[in-house]
């Protein structure tokens, strides 16, 4: 008997040693399930690597770890992501964005009519659903699901290129307020892209997983997700590894695009006051928008940033800009208020190849100016925060963790507003741009059976939950 036990013990030790050596020296298995964050403004894809427990957010062919959620239709092809972004100003009527706002959602004709004025492309009302009309060689009707499928196909191809193998399975995130039809429509979009969805996870839960909160002892988690076009605030109640969404609120028309617009309006006014005209060429407006986005990004780490754009002198306008894109809102800063930018004007004219005169508009934008232009918008972030606390019957001091999601939460003044409200610093240990995709990738690894084993996040459905919107 003793001899048999010795043999058995030796066999077990041999197996353990073989397993250890395999983990140390054999190539790690390739991830089989990808995690997708299909965002309103940007989308991304990631994988969880067995053995190391690391998440890799997969870049596109140019090194971008997220791509714009935009799809352009032309006579010859369909362009996605950054290629679509480049066509947005020259082909606006055929460049679809914000499709996530429409996917699977039921609209009354009046509700949809209130939305369509915000977009340069045609939005149609078909049997309670939104569809898009685009014109290439002919006019075609495309659904939000089809637009989403083109984005998902691009993400799938990025993952396949990186992993060097076909990908068929995915976990995908959706807003917590998505109903069953919106979730099923998102799955349908994935199916059109050749993906089988193993699980749909709520974005706030995914973010909490990225921060590791599914493995630590916290009870109440507030997730603030501020992206390019929307603000979502979710109150999560964590019990063990289970997450219950207690309350949701937000603003579907507040995000980084709005902050950009305030600065763009300010620059338009500077240009008009200096040169007496407003930029009207699509490519120059596009360059101005790109410059504004770059300024916003630079101001997250620097106190000031430069704008330098070559503009073609058009016919001089007889009056200052009124209404629309070129007007600085009346409640915003005006020259002489002590916060003016430090302008560097080059009034000397040069000639372009077309014979038109050109000027180089240069200016320095301070963080102080950017914050002042947007302070009222920054304060609006607190409104849905206060609402979820009210609906959750909680005081702000009872929140264990405040986590930030979305690129716009990088703005220092926004972090300061949140810190001042709660009296403590929000958790910023995870890249806010990648929080959701990181969490989804972790869940994809769990569903794919990767090791080391992770604690899965279980979501408790709350069928009575409704999101309060402040638009």
From Swiss-Prot:
Gene Ontology molecular-function annotations: ATP binding; ATP-dependent protein folding chaperone
Main location: other
Comp. bias (Basic and acidic residues): 317-330
Gene3D superfamilies for this protein: 3.30.30.30, 3.30.420.40, Actin, Chain A, domain 4
Cellular-component GO terms for this entry: endoplasmic reticulum
Assigned keywords, A-Z: ATP-binding, Endoplasmic reticulum, Microsome, Nucleotide-binding, Signal
Entry-linked InterPro entries: ATPase_NBD, Heat_shock_70_CS, Hsp_70_fam, HSPA13
Localization of this protein: Microsome; Endoplasmic reticulum
SUPFAM superfamilies reported for this sequence: Actin-like ATPase domain
Record bears the keyword Endoplasmic reticulum: yes
Stretches the record annotates as Disordered: 317-350
Signal peptide segment: 1-22
Pfam families, per the entry: HSP70
Family annotation (CDD domains): ASKHA_NBD_HSP70_HSPA13 (cd10237)
Binding partners and assembly: Binds UBQLN2.
Family: Belongs to the heat shock protein 70 family.
Entry function: Has peptide-independent ATPase activity.
The protein, known as: Heat shock 70 kDa protein 13
Species for this entry: Mus musculus
């Amino acid at each position: 008997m003793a001899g048999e036990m010795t043999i058995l013990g030796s066999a077990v030790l041999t197996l353990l040693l073989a397993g250890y050596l395999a983990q140390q020296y054999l190539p790690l298995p390739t991830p089989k399930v990808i995690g997708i964050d299909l965002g309103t403004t940007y989308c991304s894809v990631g994988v969880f690597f067995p053995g190391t427990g690391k998440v890799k957010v997969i870049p596109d062919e140019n090194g971008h770890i997220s791509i714009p959620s935009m799809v352009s239709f032309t006579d010859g092809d369909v362009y996605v992501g950054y290629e679509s972004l480049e066509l947005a100003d020259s082909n606006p009527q055929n460049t679809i964005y914000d499709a996530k706002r429409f996917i699977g959602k039921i609209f009354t004709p009046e509700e949809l009519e209130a939305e369509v004025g915000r977009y340069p492309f045609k939005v149609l009302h078909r049997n309670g659903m939104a569809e898009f009309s685009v014109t290439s060689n002919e006019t075609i009707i495309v659904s939000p699901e089809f637009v989403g499928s083109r984005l998902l196909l691009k993400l799938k191809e990025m993952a396949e290129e990186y992993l060097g193998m076909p990908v068929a399975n995915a976990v995908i995130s959706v807003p917590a307020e998505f109903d069953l039809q919106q979730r099923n429509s998102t799955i349908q979009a994935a199916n059109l892209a050749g993906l089988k969805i193993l699980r749909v996870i709520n974005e706030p839960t995914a973010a909490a997983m990225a921060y590791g909160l599914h493995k630590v002892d916290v009870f109440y988690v507030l997730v603030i997700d501020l992206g390019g076009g929307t603000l979502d605030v979710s109150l999560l109640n964590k019990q063990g590894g289970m997450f219950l969404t207690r309350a949701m609120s937000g603003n579907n028309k507040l995000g980084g695009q709005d902050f950009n617009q305030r600065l763009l309006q300010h620059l338009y006014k500077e240009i008009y006051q200096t040169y007496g005209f407003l930029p009207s060429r699509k490519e120059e407006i596009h360059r101005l928008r790109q410059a504004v986005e770059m300024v916003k990004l630079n101001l997250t780490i620097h106190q000031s940033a430069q704008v330098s754009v070559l503009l073609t002198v058009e016919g001089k306008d007889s009056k200052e800009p009124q209404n629309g894109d070129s007007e600085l809102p009346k409640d915003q800063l005006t020259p002489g208020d002590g916060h003016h930018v430090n302008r560097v004007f080059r009034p000397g004219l040069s000639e372009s190849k077309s014979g038109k005169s050109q000027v180089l508009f240069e200016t320095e934008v301070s963080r102080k100016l950017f914050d002042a232009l947007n302070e009222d918008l920054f304060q609006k972030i607190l409104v849905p925060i206060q609402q979820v606390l009210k609906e959750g019957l909680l005081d702000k001091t009872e929140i264990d963790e405040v986590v930030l999601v979305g690129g716009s939460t990088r703005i220092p003044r926004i972090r300061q507003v949140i810190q001042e409200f709660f009296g403590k610093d929000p958790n910023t240990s995870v890249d806010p741009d990648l929080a959701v995709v990181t969490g989804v990738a972790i869940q994809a690894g769990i569903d794919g059976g990767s090791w080391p084993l992770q604690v899965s996040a279980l979501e408790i459905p709350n069928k009575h939950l409704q999101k309060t919107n402040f638009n």
